[in-house]
C-alpha cells in the first residue's frame, strides 16, 4: 500500500495486478505465489481475505492489500491500469468482480490481461471499459507451459481478431516484432511498453509512440 500512496503523492498513474481470493474477494499482488514476497509457499488464490492478512511483505509491517482498500486509498486521484491475473479458469468470476469494484472508482482506468479470455470477456460483457492485451515472446519465456501452437498464437497476437483490444502491451525489449507493427497499422491499437527501468528506455518508448510503464525511477 505504501508504494501506491507514494505514486498518488507524485501524481503518477499506477499499474497493478488483481487476484481472486478463495472467498471471492480481490487482492493486489504481482505473483500468484507468496513465496517471493513473503517467504510462504502458498498461492494467493487458496487464501481468504482473513488468512491473507496474516502474511507480511518481507521484513516490513506491510500486508498484501485488498483491491477495495487500494481503490479507497487512491480516491480516484490517479489513473489505473488493472491487470487481471487469471488462475485455474477463474477468468469470468475475476473479470466480473473486478469490473464491479472499478464501477465505484472515480478516476480513469483501463483493464488488461495476458489471458485473451479475460480480454474477450470484457469485449462481450463490458465493452465500455478500455481493454488491453498483454503479451510477450512466449518462445523465450521459461515459465510458459503452453503448446507450440498457443505460444505462436499468443506471441503473434492472432486472437486479437476475437478480443479486439483497445491497446496492446508488450515487453520493452521485445517490442520490435511484426505482430506489433500489424497491431499499430492494421488494428490501430494503442501500444504500451513495459517495464521501463531507466530514463533512456522511457525516452525511446515515448519517441516511438508507446505509453510507458516504468518502475524504480521518476521520469
Predicted feature locations:
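Phosphate-group recognition and catalysis centered on beta-loop-alpha active-site segments
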Residues: 1-219
Amino acid at each position: 500500500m505504501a508504494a501506491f500512496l507514494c505514486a498518488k503523492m507524485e501524481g503518477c498513474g499506477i499499474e497493478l495486478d488483481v487476484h481472486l481470493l478463495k472467498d471471492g474477494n480481490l487482492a493486489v499482488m504481482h505473483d500468484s505465489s507468496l513465496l517471493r514476497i513473503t517467504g510462504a509457499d502458498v498461492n494467493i488464490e487458496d487464501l481468504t481475505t482473513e488468512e491473507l492478512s496474516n502474511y507480511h511483505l518481507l521484513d516490513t509491517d506491510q500486508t498484501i492489500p485488498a483491491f477495495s482498500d487500494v481503490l479507497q486509498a487512491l480516491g480516484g486521484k490517479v489513473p489505473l491500469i488493472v491487470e487481471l491475473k487469471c488462475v485455474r479458469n477463474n477468468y469470468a468470476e475475476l473479470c466480473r468482480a473486478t469490473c464491479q469494484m472499478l464501477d465505484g472508482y472515480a478516476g480513469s482506468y483501463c483493464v488488461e490481461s495476458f489471458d485473451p479470455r479475460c480480454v474477450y470477456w470484457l469485449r462481450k460483457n463490458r465493452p465500455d471499459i478500455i481493454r488491453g492485451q498483454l503479451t510477450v515472446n512466449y518462445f523465450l519465456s521459461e515459465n510458459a507451459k503452453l503448446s507450440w501452437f498457443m505460444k505462436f498464437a499468443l506471441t503473434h497476437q492472432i486472437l486479437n481478431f476475437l478480443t479486439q483490444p483497445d491497446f496492446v502491451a508488450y515487453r520493452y525489449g521485445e517490442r520490435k516484432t511484426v505482430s506489433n507493427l500489424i497491431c499499430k497499422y492494421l488494428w490501430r491499437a494503442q501500444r504500451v511498453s513495459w517495464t521501463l527501468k531507466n530514463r533512456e528506455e522511457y525516452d525511446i518508448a515515448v519517441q516511438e509512440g508507446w505509453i510507458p510503464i516504468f518502475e524504480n525511477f521518476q521520469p
